[in-house]
């Protein structure tokens, strides 16, 4: 305003105290930030067997590499707050399985030689996240989140399998990129069942533990009809 950066405003971000001036961050060409490839495994979906059970995941690398999994596969809804998740009687066992999948991703990226090395020396990357269809739930703030106001429910985990209270900006960029990648878990949630047959997603509303986060994407249409996030 008047040639100076604004420091006050009425813009609010769910999960961040107070209000302030709106700052829009743009990530240019986010694909392959860690691996040089949008899909580090070369597949839109992969499976892994843990204790005799098969788990499906999508590994997408954009702004930050994130592995998306179905919360239902782990016996949870994906709408849990961090406090609710930590209070689950089988929380430790769920986290053990999540770490195996995350560690496998670290090995794929070349960040670790085995699962133990990944747990010790590659704790921050890749991230892992629950992703599931929109449903009504109550956020940690007490705010009621309605299914019609979001495009998916997401829960990101940080170091030592700590569920994040909100949703990371780089995680949101990866999520909207995954939504534009046909066949990924995120894409099937956002665009499946005839909701968006073009698989073109310029705006996604992510329901997280403390509310809703918006992420936007500028797209280039490819010759095969797919879209690249610019």
Regions found by a protein language model. Give the residues of each.
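Non-transmembrane, aqueous-exposed alpha-helical and coiled segments at domain scale
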Residues: 1-230
